[in-house]
């Protein structure tokens, strides 16, 4: 190919989440913790819940099916499909191979891509791999599908930080949401902040304090690198003296284990901005010699920059947290659920032309920052209009979910814990509470082979 494909990015998005939820305020009362521990301390209002009828395969089957139907895409037009998930059912067989049964009727088996892991970063890794394919000599002009999906389940003491979801991105050229080339910044290190060494359990091992420090440290490394790379790229494009700071971006979207951490992350961006441009903050000159490593658990510093960043958070980040607040921690899905929340938070005319900064983090750890540009054409029938229109069902669907009592939620979690990886097994939950068109687990035979049906 003589030149790069133009405007490679997101052409369509499909987002699914559980039809059941538990109220976090009711969970506070049930767990006999102080009022506000989950709702104020974590910033969470509701949490999506999967019964034993739903697993990672069923979530992804549902999402792919709906993406293809809603966007009227022929399965023969897909040349790449990659799944980012840490919700592992099999150490050998990938989720991607399960999804290939949806392609059988079309006869299309020429689909590259496979599963990728590393905690909550893997959806971003799958996205980057799809971009590499489209910008390579192997690209044959077809679309790529990126799947970011997980079921987040914790032991009882950490259960309020769970959730579940699956998000698919249809990737191609001439997209209404363009992923900026040449400006990604990454930071990767070894840490035992969050990991899953017990393959017979759905529960992670978590060092909560270290996990927060790793997340914020990764942000501190990625943001200045990203700004520097963006400035250099724009200079090469003839845009001299373009200042890349907090004012350059129209929105900041973060990986969201819980909403309060995202609010703290915006405060870290302001801290970074202060370190880079101290003259902008005349009232903070006494802090000019501040060192990042001394600030992660300094509550006085945190409060100063939380207060300083409040307006920025409200304007440029809070609109991206609707699904995180209502569905919970979706692991690798959460960053892109934030993008969806942003896209459905305002009129399409207000979205047009915006530049969005994205921060992806996965424990262990791996992190990247990158940016998106939204098309300036928001006219009826435009690719941007079609993308956003195909997301209008999400807000009503959030309201249509069925509420569980905390006791019912606890019972569902106990059933999952007792029967995880059991074979043979027939799920006990009713499929009648699932949204229409949902794929669900019908049974597991003695050889651990899973059979699925659609509502």
UniProtKB/Swiss-Prot annotation:
EC number(s) per entry: 2.3.3.10
Coiled coil start-end:
none
**Broadest EC class assigned to this enzyme:** transferase
| One MF annotation (Gene Ontology) recorded for this entry | hydroxymethylglutaryl-CoA synthase activity
**PROSITE patterns (alphabetical):** HMG_COA_SYNTHASE
Reaction(s) catalysed by this chain, per the record, are: acetoacetyl-CoA + acetyl-CoA + H2O = (3S)-3-hydroxy-3-methylglutaryl-CoA + CoA + H(+)
SUPFAM superfamilies with a match to the protein in the record: Thiolase-like
Q: Which UniProt keywords apply?
A: Lipid biosynthesis, Lipid metabolism, Steroid biosynthesis, Steroid metabolism, Sterol biosynthesis, Sterol metabolism, Transferase
Top-level taxon: Eukaryota
* Pathway, per record: Metabolic intermediate biosynthesis; (R)-mevalonate biosynthesis; (R)-mevalonate from acetyl-CoA: step 2/3
Which residues hold (3S)-3-hydroxy-3-methylglutaryl-CoA? 120, 161, 211, 255, 264, 329, 363
Which residues act catalytically here? 86 (proton donor/acceptor), 120 (acyl-thioester intermediate), 255 (proton donor/acceptor)
Give the signal peptide as a residue range, or say none if absent: none
Q: Which GO terms describe its biological process?
A: acetyl-CoA metabolic process; farnesyl diphosphate biosynthetic process, mevalonate pathway; sterol biosynthetic process
| Recorded family membership | Belongs to the thiolase-like superfamily. HMG-CoA synthase family.
**Family annotation (PANTHER family):** 3-HYDROXY-3-METHYLGLUTARYL COENZYME A SYNTHASE, HYDROXYMETHYLGLUTARYL-COA SYNTHASE
**Job description of the protein:** This enzyme condenses acetyl-CoA with acetoacetyl-CoA to form HMG-CoA, which is the substrate for HMG-CoA reductase.
Name of the molecule in the record: Hydroxymethylglutaryl-CoA synthase 2
Organism lineage: Eukaryota, Metazoa, Ecdysozoa, Arthropoda, Hexapoda
Designated gene of the protein: HMGCS-2
């Amino acid at each position: 190919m003589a030149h790069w494909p133009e405007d490679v990015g997101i052409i369509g998005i499909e987002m699914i989440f559980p039809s059941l939820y538990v109220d976090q305020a009711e969970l506070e009362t049930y767990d006999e913790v102080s009022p506000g521990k989950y709702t104020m301390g974590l910033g969470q209002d509701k949490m999506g819940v999967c019964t034993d009828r739903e697993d990672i395969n069923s979530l992804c089957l549902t999402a792919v099916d709906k993406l293809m139907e809603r966007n009227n895409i022929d399965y023969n037009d897909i040349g790449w499909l990659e799944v980012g998930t840490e919700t592992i059912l099999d150490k050998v067989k990938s989720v991607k191979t399960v999804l290939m049964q949806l392609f059988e009727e079309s006869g299309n088996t020429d689909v590259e891509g496979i599963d990728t892991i590393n905690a909550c970063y893997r959806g971003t890794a799958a996205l980057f791999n799809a971009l590499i394919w489209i910008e390579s000599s192997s690209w044959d002009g077809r679309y790529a599908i990126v799947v970011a999906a997980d079921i987040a389940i914790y032991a009882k003491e950490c259960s309020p930080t769970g959730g579940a979801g699956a998000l698919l991105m249809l990737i191609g050229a001439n997209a209404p949401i363009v992923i900026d080339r040449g400006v990604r910044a990454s930071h990767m290190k070894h840490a035992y902040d969050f990991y899953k060494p017990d393959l017979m359990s759905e529960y992670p091992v978590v060092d909560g304090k270290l996990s927060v420090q790793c997340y914020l440290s990764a942000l501190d490394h990625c943001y200045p690198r990203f700004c520097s790379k963006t400035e250099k790229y724009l200079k090469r494009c003839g845009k001299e003296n373009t200042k890349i700071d907090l004012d350059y971006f129209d929105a900041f979207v973060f990986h969201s284990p819980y909403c309060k951490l995202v609010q703290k992350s915006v405060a870290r961006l302001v801290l970074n901005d202060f370190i880079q441009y101290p003259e902008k903050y005349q009232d903070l000159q006494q802090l000019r010699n501040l060192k990042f490593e001394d600030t992660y658990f300094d509550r006085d510093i945190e409060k100063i920059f939380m207060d300083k960043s409040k307006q920025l958070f409200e304007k440029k980040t809070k609109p991206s947290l609707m699904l995180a607040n209502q569905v919970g921690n979706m692991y690798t899905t959460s960053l892109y659920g934030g993008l969806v929340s942003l896209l459905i938070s305002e009129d399409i005319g207000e979205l047009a032309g915006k530049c969005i900064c994205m921060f992806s983090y996965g424990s262990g750890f791996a992190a990247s920052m990158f940016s998106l540009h939204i098309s300036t054409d928001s006219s009826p029938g435009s690719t941007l209009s079609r993308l956003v229109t195909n997301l209008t069902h999400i807000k009503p669907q959030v309201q249509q979910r069925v509420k569980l009592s905390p006791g019912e939620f606890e019972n569902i979690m106990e059933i999952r814990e007792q029967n995880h990886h059991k074979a043979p097994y027939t799920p006990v939950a009713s499929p009648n509470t699932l949204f229409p068109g949902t794929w669900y687990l019908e049974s597991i035979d003695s050889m651990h082979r899973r059979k699925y049906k659609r509502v």
